[in-house]
Each structure stands twice: as structure tokens, then as C-alpha cells.
């Protein structure tokens, strides 16, 4: 079956791992929620009932040092004095990343917001191509899979992140997945002759492993 192939590139990417504000490490492979967010940005927030998979490559990892400010006294109008507290944060970035997304979405491209890879300073560009994917067992590399596939480390990651306007903060849909350096996939990218883990997005927070015929 022919899938849309989206090749996103940037000079750097940051997919925050954990909640430590001072040491902000990055996932080496973005969580599923990142890819869902990118697809909804490109094809529209209301898309559902589609299949997708993705891979991630990068050249190196770099840790930057930033000064962060927190407003602690709203009664002071001056930028000086005790209005702000500041500290340093160590932020980890993937250097020259390439994220390749495959999807069967067949709707017009919208691109509702600026494309970035995890942070607003990681601006990205996207190239659109095609790729055939078939139901054939093949070895896949460096991908998140269901926890019952492969031998990689199991972690809890976000499946989807939705901003809740009524609450004023984000709702997180999470689950346990396994990050495998190498695994046996049910589907194969015909051009690359490599395995790809496919997922089926049914609706908000409802994402399942897809292993059927295409």
C-alpha cells in the first residue's frame, strides 16, 4: 500500500524526557505523542482513524546551558529587583535530526502552525514523498513498539498531549512502550527494506499497534 512519506529535518531537536527542569534530557526517539502532534499540525486537528509509523536519525547529541527566568513577584513592574528569579538549565539536543513519518492519511495539507521538533527554537522543514509498505516480517531499528515486542527498555511515554482550555493545562495520555534498537516488525518499507512499527490512531488518546494487512 502506498503511504505518504514526510521527511522532517532540522539543525536540532529536543523531546523532553522526564520532568527535571534543571537537567532537561531528550528522548533519542521522539514519543508517539510528538508524531501525532506533527500530523495534526500538518493535516488538521480533527483527523482520526489513520495509520502511521516513523523513524528517527541524528548525527550527535549536544548539551546546551541556558539561563531561565521565573516571575515570582507580580507586584513589581520593573524588570529589575525581586520580580524574577533565575537559574541555569542544561538542555540536551539531537544534532541534525531527521524524522521520517509514514501515514495513510489522504486529506489536504493544512499546516496550521510553525513546524518544529519538540521546542520552538528547533524549526523544521518538511519534504513530502511516497513509500510502499507491505505486510512482511522484516527487521526494524530504533523504534518504539508495544511492550510485548523485542527486548529493549520499557518506559512510560505520552501517546497524545492535548491542551485543555477549560482547565488551563495539558491532558496527557500515557502508556508503557518498549524502545528497541532492533526488533522483528510485521510490516516492511519496500524501498529501504527495513521493518516499520505501525500504529492506528482511532481518536483522542486511543492509539493501538497495527499488525493487519494494508
Residue positions per predicted region:
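Primarily extracytoplasmic ectodomains and periplasmic/lumenal surface modules that are beta-strand-rich
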Residues: 13-14, 45-49, 108-109
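Glycine/small-residue-rich interface belts in oligomeric ring/scaffold proteins
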Residues: 19-80
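Residue-level detector of functional hotspots within protein domains
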Residues: 1, 13, 40, 85-89
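Internal, well-folded beta-alpha domain core
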Residues: 59-214
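Flexible, active-site-adjacent loop/turn segments at secondary-structure boundaries
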Residues: 13, 25-27, 92
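Beta-strand secondary-structure signal
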Residues: 5-7, 53, 100-102
